[in-house]
């Protein structure tokens, strides 16, 4: 996975595509717990302590109102680890009543992971294509000399 990471463009794409289907705010946090994509653009750049819990514990974390009051940058909802090749690369959060979101959470997470995998594969294909072009250019230059 070297050379690939979850970026703000991909995070915002996940948010936009998901929020067209589900009527709730979506946040995407990077591997350091920072919000890098959100339906609430004012939250982008904030540290999300709920995401830090997901990253450190490697599991789904439900946040109710009582917990949200004690954590920084957190609202009631559910937070799920985003995995790529078994490694947690970020967190996806759905804002709202955890009990109501649980049924959507896994589906949203699976869809986001599929988008991440597709992006990673496209990156690898582009890299492979560049390496092939470079090899051909080197062979042509070697023949000219």
Please provide the spans of the model-predicted regions.
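Short intrinsically disordered, low-complexity coil segments enriched in acidic
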Residues: 68, 144-145
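Detector for Asparagine
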Residues: 25-27, 79, 100, 138, ...
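Sensory/regulatory domains in signal-transduction proteins
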Residues: 57-114
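Juxtadomain coupling helices with adjacent low-complexity linkers
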Residues: 2-17, 96-143
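Structured interaction and signal-relay segments at domain junctions
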Residues: 2-74
């Amino acid at each position: 996975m070297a050379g690939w990471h979850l970026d703000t463009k991909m995070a915002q794409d996940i948010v936009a595509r998901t929020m067209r289907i589900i009527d709730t705010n979506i946040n995407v946090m990077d591997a350091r717990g920072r919000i890098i994509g959100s339906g609430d653009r004012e939250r982008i750049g904030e540290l999300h302590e709920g995401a830090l819990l997901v990253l450190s514990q490697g599991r789904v974390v439900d946040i109710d109102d009582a917990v949200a009051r004690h954590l920084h940058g957190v609202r009631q909802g559910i937070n799920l680890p985003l995995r790529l090749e078994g490694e947690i690369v970020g967190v996806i959060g759905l804002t709202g009543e955890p009990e109501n979101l649980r049924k959507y959470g896994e589906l949203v997470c699976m869809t986001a992971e599929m988008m991440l995998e597709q992006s990673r594969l496209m990156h690898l294909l582009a890299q492979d294509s560049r390496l092939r072009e470079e090899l051909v250019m080197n062979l042509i230059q070697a023949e000219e000399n």
